[in-house]
Every structure is written in structure tokens, then in C-alpha cells.
Amino acid sequence: LLTAFYQPSTRPRLAHEAAMLRLGGKVTCFSDAKMTRAGDFYQESIKDTVKMLGFYGDVIVMRHFQQGAPHEAAKWASIPIINGGDGWGEHPTQILTDFYTVLREKGRIDGLKWLAVGDMRMRTMHSLAYGLSQFDCPITFVSPPDMSLTDEMKADLTNYNLNFREAEHVEQAIADADVILVEPVVQPDYTKSRDERSGDVGGTPSNYKITRELLSTKAKSDAILLHSLPRMDEIPADVDITRWSRYW
């Protein structure tokens, strides 16, 4: 397994590497493009990089700040490419992990009602919506107005026959949800290889927080709560030990 990570990562990179090692395979990687010819003076192209990587392993997991980069890599690579997250594009392996968690906990995916809370521009949300279009699952999206589904995304989801609606406040939708998936509304710039902003980056408005009180008074007792992590203040730490949390 080759892991080519042009952006910071904790879970996707380590999870793929751990999985390969547990299966008896081997791993070689780079996790900082600045330490390669793709990130220094030469700015080596994706085409040339993946053609070279193809000689070193059997499959590549790529995370990149450019939307569509893994797709571009797949045009030139002689071995399979797994998308580990591409800019604001998609994050399919994260959603496959979430679907596995739901299947393990609930025994099914079809028929479950989903609630997605957070920034709908995020790659995780895109992959969630596309993934749910393959199942009989209604979903409600809750996000700040400037982070809502784009008209283009809505048209895509309509074409895929996804049963979806939007709500302004999490309290309007949480009571019916079997699965609650949360992402931050305070985001880094995913089009950069590294976002190193310092100081106060703001907090999460109450409309988009999942608190212990909200869960205990509004949510189903057997609902499950997911988060791709890292989190900020959208899920307080005291939720971790409740019956709903499934992000650990």
C-alpha cells in the first residue's frame, strides 16, 4: 500500500495503513508533500508522481487539496487509486466506514432516517448524499445558509432520486432521526495543502450543536450519533459517554 497524502490526516492515513498491516501487507508513504518533489521547487505533476509510485506498490491511497486530483491520478496510474479525500470534493472511504458502523449497529441501512448537520460544502457530506442515493433512506440537511447545498448539488441528488429536505434548526429534525451525522461549521480551507490559521476561528451556533440535553429531550433513545472527526465544539465532550455516541 502506498499512501500519498498532500494534506494533513490522522484517521484516514493511519486507518488505511493499519488495515494493510493487519492484513499482512506492507506500507510505504509520504504524508507531507513539501518533503517530496511534488511540493518543492519542481512541483512535480500528479501524472508523473503516480506513474512513478506505480512501480513501488499495488494500490495508492491519495488525499489531495485539489478537487478531482484522485480522479486525475487514476488516468495515469498503473495501479488502483483510493480517494482519501479531495479538497471540497468527496470522501468516500469515510462514508463507507460510517455505513459499516450503521449496518453493525442497526443491522440494516435501508429504511433508516438520517439527519446531517454541518457544512454541506464538505466532501464528507457530498459522499454521504451520493451514498444514500443507493438506499431507501430519507435525509434532512441542517446547515447555515451560506453553507447549504448548492443548486447544482440539489439537482444531482434529485437526479439520483434521493429523498431529501432541508431544515433551519437541528431541533426541527432530530426527533425522527435514526442516524445523526455531524460535521463542523467552522472549517479550514480545504483547497490548501495546509491551513495554519491562528487565533480565534469562531464557534458553532446553537442551531448546529448536538448537546447532551438536546439528545436526551428530543432524540430517539436508540438513535446513533456519528462524526468523522476532528470535532470542535459542535459535539461537547460530555456527549461521548452517552448511549448515542458511535464516533469512537
For every predicted segment, state its role.
Residues 1, 110-112, 222:
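Phosphate-coordination loops involved in phosphoryl transfer and adenosine-cofactor binding
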Residues 1-103, 232-233, 237:
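Phosphate/diphosphate ligand-binding glycine-rich loop within oxidoreductases
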Residues 6-24, 104-183, 188:
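Glycine-rich phosphate/diphosphate-binding loop of Rossmann-like nucleotide-binding domains
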Residues 23, 56, 76-78, 135, ...:
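Short, structured coil segments at secondary-structure junctions
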Residues 30, 84, 142, 183, ...:
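Generic beta-sheet signal
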Residues 52-55, 73-76, 80, 106-110, ...:
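Solvent-exposed alpha-helices and their adjacent loops that cap or buttress functional pockets
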Residues 80-85, 139, 245-248:
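Short hydrophobic/aromatic-enriched beta-strand-loop microsegments
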Residues 158-240, 247:
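Rossmann-like adenosine-cofactor binding region
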